[in-house]
Structures are given as structure tokens and as C-alpha cells.
A protein has these predicted regions:
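Short, flexible loop segments at the rims of nucleotide/cofactor-binding pockets, characterized by
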Residues: 33-37, 72-73, 181-187, 205-210, ...
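Alpha-helical scaffold elements within enzyme catalytic domains, especially in hydrolases
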Residues: 47, 86, 181, 219-222, ...
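A short, well-structured beta->alpha microelement
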Residues: 178-199
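A conserved amphipathic helix/loop scaffold
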Residues: 76, 207-355
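Hydrophobic anchor at the start of a short beta-strand
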Residues: 56, 95, 189, 227, ...
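Structural motif
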Residues: 7, 202-203, 226
Length: 355
């Protein structure tokens, strides 16, 4: 769809989305109940920046309690300002608040606005005014090439939905886990399609790409920088059959997935050195260098040259360790961020957001 759009937009409801669609523990949701997930908004900003070919808006920004989530708390003071500036730091042309005035009737009468139902100022209005004043005095935010390209493929999303092979194994969650780990290392991320040019990015991450065209494989193999390919990649034909030869079938790395199993949430497979494989695990055959070994001795990931293949759905600890090691080897600067702190690089400034 994005090929035919002049501009893209999305609706940003950090507190509502934390409650009804972010996959996280109750402890995490309690800790960020009044702030939102520190990565969820940024992920969608980065995604729709690419869908809109650089031009995108926040069409609806949450200004207070909503009416549709399981629980609808008020944001902490300052969060409307933070969410607004975070959107601009990721390239938004506009942030529109939903809504102007809280309706005193009908099914959305409990949904907050910039004004109360009696037309008096609601708390969010002062923060929106503050952002407007700051924008007037600020430099224009000019985007720059991020260190990392994260490849996102809607066809793969459809394939995962048709054959997830296990409850809760969704392509979006796999992509998001990788994005969260990268951001936790202080990295800025461009979310690109498999057809976009990623040749100038320092690191390319490509998890869960069931179908990989010959052109994509060739472009990945010719990169000078590191490439991390994730589980299930290259396992399917374009028409959604099992690939022969078996996946991932990548140039420059000798690894074959011979069997796949999916795991209950309460039976993760521990990795040597920390972290685990959860949900999706592959049996790998290779003559190349092991990159990660499971605690039971089985192979979990393989690396040779600039290409690393992860043969399982790594948890956050395992992904963070892997990306940290790969970045240090490639001399890509990382900063392990404290919980809730994130940053975004632009051409002139580094933005820091404290959730």
C-alpha cells in the first residue's frame, strides 16, 4: 500500500496500547502504566516513516485517559510533551492530538481531550502549548541514516499468521523483540522493506523472513558490514511451500535447518552464557563456526564472516548479548541503556527520552 501513498500516518496511544497489545509481564506493565512502553511508539514512528517514504504524521496522539483499554490511567505529568517530541525526533511532520474537546455524550465520552467536557483546559493542553513554543525556537529536525537497518516484510507477516506453528508466535513480536534489544543498546534503527537499499547501514538485522528472493540474498551477501538473519528465514518458497534446498540457504554461510520445534512459554531452552531460546527453536547442521550453544549442547546460532544466523527466537537477554558482541566486533558504538531510557540520533542532535 505504501508504494501508492504520498504520506503515511498512525494513531499513537501509548497507555492504551501497553494494556491491550504489548506482550509484556504484569510487572513491566505496572512500571510503565502511566508512560507507555519505551519502544512501542518509536517502532511505529520508524515503520511509518518508511511506509510514507520519509513523510508521516501522528494522526491521533493520546492526550490523557482513553476509554477503550482494559485499564485507562492518566499519563504522568510531562508525558504528552515527551511523546510529542519523540515523534518529531523520528521525523514526524505533525502531531495531532485526539481530541480537541472531550465529548460529553456517546460511547467516547470518557475519552480525554485537550479540553474538558465543559471546555475548560485539560492537563494536556499546557504541555501541547509548551511543545509548540519549543518547536518555534528549535532547529528543524533533519533525519540521518541510522546505524541499523531492520528488515520488515508484510508477506512474511502473512505467512507467519497462516502457519504460526505455535500459540502466540507472531512475526510482529519477533521483529519487535529485535527492535527493543537494538534500542536497548542505544542504537537508532531504520525499519526498511526487503526491497529498500540497506547497503550503507552499519548493521542489517533480518529476522523471520520466510521468503527471501535471490536478489535479497545476493545484496545481503555483498555487504561489508555485519548481517544478522533470524529464525525461519529462507525456509519458504514465494508460494509458501517448504524450500528445497532447506532454509536458510544463504550465500557465504553453510547452515541448514533440519527440524523445527515450538515451545511452551514455560519451557525455554537456556543458552550458554545467558539468555534463552523461547517459542521457536531449530535444529541446525553446519560446518561453520558456532556462535551460540544451548545449555544442552545443541547449536543455537552460527556465524561466518559478516553473516550470523540465529536458529531460534532469542529472548531479550540473548539478543542483547548477540547484538552487543557483533557491534563491538564491527566497531559500532553501543551504550547499554538503563531501563526506560532511550535515544534517537538525527543529523544535528541526539534526543534522549526518559520513560
Amino acid at each position: 500500500v505504501g508504494d501508492y501513498l504520498d504520506i503515511a500516518s498512525w494513531d499513537s496511544y501509548p497507555l492504551g496500547f501497553l494494556e491491550d497489545r504489548v506482550v509484556a509481564s504484569d510487572e513491566f506493565k505496572q512500571a510503565f502504566a502511566r508512560q507507555g512502553d519505551p519502544d512501542f511508539q518509536a517502532f511505529h514512528h520508524d515503520l511509518y516513516r518508511t511506509v510514507g517514504k520519509g513523510r508521516w504524521w501522528v494522526m491521533e496522539q493520546q492526550p490523557g485517559p482513553v476509554n477503550w483499554a482494559p485499564y485507562n490511567p492518566s499519563p504522568l505529568p510531562g508525558m504528552i510533551r515527551l511523546w510529542s517530541w519523540e515523534a518529531f525526533a523520528h521525523g514526524a511532520e505533525a502531531v495531532c492530538y485526539f481530541r480537541w474537546r472531550q465529548a460529553p455524550f456517546a460511547q467516547e465520552q470518557m475519552h480525554a481531550g485537550l479540553l474538558r467536557p465543559d471546555s475548560a483546559d485539560a492537563p494536556a493542553l499546557a504541555e501541547a502549548k509548551e511543545v509548540a513554543r519549543e518547536i518555534a525556537d528549535a532547529h528543524s529536525v533533519e533525519e540521518c541514516l541510522s546505524e541499523v537497518a531492520l528488515l520488515f516484510d508484510y508477506k512474511s507477516d502473512w505467512m507467519w499468521r497462516i502457519l504460526p506453528q505455535g500459540r502466540g508466535l507472531e512475526y510482529f513480536n519477533l521483529i519487535y523483540d529485535n527492535y527493543r534489544a537494538l534500542r536497548g543498546l542505544g542504537l537508532s534503527v531504520d525499519i526498511l522493506s526487503t526491497e529498500d537499499d540497506f547497503s550503507k547501514h552499519k548493521l542489517v538485522v533480518a529476522p523471520g523472513l520466510l521468503y527471501m528472493s535471490d536478489d535479497l540474498k545476493e545484496r545481503l551477501s555483498k555487504r561489508d558490514g555485519p548481517t544478522v538473519v533470524g529464525p525461519r528465514s529462507g525456509s519458504s518458497t514465494e508460494n509458501f511451500g517448504i524450500n528445497r534446498p532447506l532454509g536458510p540457504n544463504l550465500p557465504n554461510i553453510n547452515v541448514t535447518t533440519t527440524r523445527v520445534e515450538t515451545l511452551r512459554p514455560d519451557m525455554p531452552i537456556l543458552l550458554e552464557g545467558g539468555g534463552c531460546v523461547k517459542g521457536w527453536s531449530e535444529a541446525l547442521e553446519t560446518s561453520d563456526t558456532p556462535f551460540r550453544i544451548m545449555a544442552n549442547g545443541d547449536l543455537a546460532a552460527v556465524s561466518t564472516g559478516n553473516i550470523t544466523y540465529l536458529g531460534g527466537w532469542f529472548d531479550n537477554e540473548a539478543l542483547t548479548r548477540a547484538f552487543n558482541e557483533i557491534c563491538l566486533t564491527a566497531e559500532i558504538k553501543v551504550i547499554e541503556m538503563p531501563e526506560g531510557l532511550r535515544r534517537r540520533a538525527t543529523s544535528k542532535e541526539m534526543f534522549w527520552f526518559n520513560y
